[in-house]
């Protein structure tokens, strides 16, 4: 099957020149930008010896060099995607001297005019200044990753925030539980008055099914659940993987219900409201959005070429939409064992990330609607996008030999959060039922393998149907074009048909 190509025309404005934010393979991106060369690829080419044969084929050394150049350029495209055909140069020039001068002047102003009487405010202002300068450095030095819309600086700042979050987790890992709680109290003193109610009962009176009770469960968190799954579908774009994650998350809730009481749910809440309504409709809507974006024609005009003010405003708003969108294929009938295992690993890592959310909230006693909890969810959701893109290229493109920087940092964040939970939740994990954990891991692996295998099998069947259709058509064409049986048509019609 051929990949559908959606990008039509070459973007000409600074905003338009931004590259494909889809999860298409790095090979497609390389073909779209043949003029861009990585550091290795832009080096002067060493003359290679040619064979004496008339074909003039390149020597094996030249072939190896070409292969290395392809590998280097593939990683550059997925790790720091360039922006071509820029027409508004001002927004894409570095401006490093100006940025340095403005940053230093701003810090000097606030350092001299602010009131320094309050020690807590001094500490908070110092931390904000550290974050500010770190993000400035990230804009200048960090890679923007595989995305460039609305601007590469946005993704560099996001990457800088992820590195700061990772460093914060490393700092918290070397503190004891009371110290960490004191830090949270310093950030928000209201947390002193909040405690997890371990005596509260969940999942009671499951036989009482009424419309009022069902409507009571459809609160703001249910809408968040639905939108979260729609966002996951846009990120992963594979029905089988999404349903594997959905089903296994319900199994995860059952397994860890003895540690997290809020995981206890009635059967109709877990099966109907969660799996079918929230998860199912969210997956359907997310994949539908992807389908619409794949079918859309992407033809960008420079903002300089637009004469009307309304058109310029509309074009500026469209800068926050993808430059193009391509269908992706996590699995195909010829997938290797390593690719098979990589997709299973993606499913399991997704479960760990979801578990970290609930364990962090439970161990450090925060309400579900607290700004730290909400902020972390939004940050993780944004940072997962380039990470999944880089992981997809690493899994599917044989020329990509190492994982992207954002994906590496995300993996470190996921593991650090899990370590922080285990270290500070000793009392909670002492009640862990080992048999439940062993069964959970076993079921995770079995269901992951089963869903991935079914996805490959389904792909094989679809390809067989597509390949068998032309053969059947060829067989039926001669039969339909042959002379009709005698006595059914007049000689004039037979002659016309012949």
From Swiss-Prot:
Glycosylation positions in this chain: 205
Originating organism: Drosophila melanogaster (Fruit fly)
Full protein name: Phosphatidylserine synthase
Family: Belongs to the phosphatidyl serine synthase family.
PANTHER family on file: PHOSPHATIDYLINOSITOL SYNTHASE (PTHR15362), PHOSPHATIDYLSERINE SYNTHASE 1 (PTHR15362:SF15)
InterPro entries linked to this entry: PSS (IPR004277)
Reported consequences of knocking out the gene: Lethal at the first instar larval stage. RNAi-mediated knockdown in salivary glands reduces phosphatidylserine (PS) levels and depletes Akt1 from the plasma membrane contributing to cell growth defects probably by affecting the insulin pathway; causes a shift from phospholipid synthesis to neutral lipid synthesis, which results in ectopic lipid accumulation in third instar larval salivary glands; reduces mitochondrial PS levels thereby impairing mitochondrial protein import and mitochondrial integrity.
Positions in the Cytoplasmic compartment: 1-92, 144-153, 261-266, 361-367, 424-436
Locations listed in the record: Endoplasmic reticulum membrane
Transmembrane segments: 93-113, 123-143, 154-174, 240-260, 267-287, 340-360, 368-388, 403-423, 437-457
Pfam families noted in UniProt: PSS
């Amino acid at each position: 099957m051929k990949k559908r190509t959606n990008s039509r025309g070459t973007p000409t404005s600074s905003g338009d020149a931004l590259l494909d934010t889809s999860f298409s393979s790095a090979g497609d991106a390389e073909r779209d930008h043949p003029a861009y060369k990585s550091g290795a690829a832009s080096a002067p080419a060493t003359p290679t010896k040619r064979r004496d044969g008339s074909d003039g084929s390149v020597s094996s050394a030249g072939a190896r060099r070409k292969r290395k150049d392809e590998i280097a350029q593939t990683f550059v495209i997925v790790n720091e995607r360039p922006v071509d055909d820029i027409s508004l140069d001002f927004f894409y020039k570095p401006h490093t001297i100006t940025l340095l001068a403005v940053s230093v002047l701003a810090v000097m102003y606030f350092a001299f005019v602010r009131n320094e009487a309050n020690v807590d405010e001094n500490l908070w202002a110092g931390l904000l200044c550290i974050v500010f300068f770190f993000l400035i450095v990230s804009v200048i030095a960090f890679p923007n990753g595989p995305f460039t819309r609305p601007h590469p600086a946005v993704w560099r700042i996001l990457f800088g925030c992820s590195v700061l979050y990772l460093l914060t987790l490393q700092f918290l890992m070397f503190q004891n539980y009371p110290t960490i709680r004191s830090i949270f109290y310093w950030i928000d003193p209201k947390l002193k008055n909040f405690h997890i109610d371990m005596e509260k009962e969940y999942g009671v009176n499951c036989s009482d099914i009424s419309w009022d009770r069902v409507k009571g469960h459809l609160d703001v968190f249910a809408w968040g659940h639905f939108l979260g799954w729609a966002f996951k579908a846009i990120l992963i774009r594979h029905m089988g993987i999404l349903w594997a994650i959905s089903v296994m998350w319900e199994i995860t809730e059952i397994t860890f219900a003895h540690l997290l009481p809020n995981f206890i749910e009635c059967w109709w809440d877990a099966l109907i409201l969660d799996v079918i309504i929230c998860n199912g409709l969210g997956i359907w809507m997310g994949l539908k959005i992807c389908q619409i974006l794949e079918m859309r024609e992407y033809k960008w005009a420079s903002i300089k070429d637009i004469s009307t003010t309304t058109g310029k405003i509309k074009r500026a708003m469209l800068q926050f939409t993808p430059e193009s969108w391509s269908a992706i294929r996590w699995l195909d009938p010829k997938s290797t064992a390593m690719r098979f295992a990589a997709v299973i690993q993606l499913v399991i890592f997704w479960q760990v990330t979801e578990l970290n959310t609930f364990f962090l909230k439970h161990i450090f006693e925060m309400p579900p609607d607290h700004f730290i909890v909400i902020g972390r969810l939004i940050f993780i959701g944004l940072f997962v996008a380039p990470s999944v893109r880089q992981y997809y290229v690493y899994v599917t493109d044989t020329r990509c030999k190492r994982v992207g920087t954002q994906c590496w940092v995300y993996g470190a964040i996921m593991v650090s959060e899990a370590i922080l939970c285990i270290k500070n939740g000793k009392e909670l994990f002492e009640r862990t039922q080992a048999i439940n954990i062993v069964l959970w891991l076993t079921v995770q692996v079995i269901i992951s393998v089963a869903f991935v295998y079914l996805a490959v099998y389904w792909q094989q069947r679809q390809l067989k149907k597509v390949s068998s259709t032309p053969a059947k058509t060829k067989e039926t064409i001669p039969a339909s074009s042959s002379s009709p049986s005698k006595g059914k048509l007049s000689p004039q019609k037979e002659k016309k048909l012949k």
